[in-house]
Amino acid sequence: MKNSFFSKFTPKEPKFFPLLKQLSDVLSASSVLLVESMEHDLPTERADYYKQIKDMEREGDRLTHLIFDELSTTFITPFDREDIHDLASCMDDVIDGINSSAKRIVIYNPRPISESGKELSRLIHEEAINIGKAMDELETFRKNPKPLRDYCTQLHDIENQADDVYELFITKLFEEEKDCIELIKIKEIMHELEKTTDAAEHVRENIKKPDRKVFIKAEQDTWNY
């Protein structure tokens, strides 16, 4: 009993980094499935990919809740517990967005996915890759923050690309699509994909929080000196 009590006050930093990395791995795997699903037009094939993505989404939920549980029972965390909470939650939101996009494709069963839709899925995958790389740097960013900051910059650039792809496509969609039902289907799917790229941007914002706080603390220490 004594050991159990005092263990809460013992540094347990390492466990959060592997859990966050595992969550980013699930995100990356989900994004790969999304990209692959865009190349298939048969309803049965789309449904099969959605099932696989749904399994990934459930695993993402499991890891996210595990991180939350660990936060509630750990006294010392590697950085602010609310930042760990928000980072995990935002990564889970991206996985949820991928799942929602795949779900809409199955439900609406649109014509072959446009090149713009495929491009958005590829950009989501690029965001997932950069998030995974950022998670690799999270444990050591205090010693060398540059790689983490570089990945955050790349995430921001990718999200801007996604905005451009989405806005151009929607403009053309309303100009050229004459089938109102098909227009609604495609717009819903594209909107969900674009929302998912936005969710990845929120991950970037939460990755930056610990770095920003460390920087401010260093500046304050300099002033105090």
Language model features: what each stretch is:
Residues 1-225:
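Cytosolic, long alpha-helical scaffolding segments
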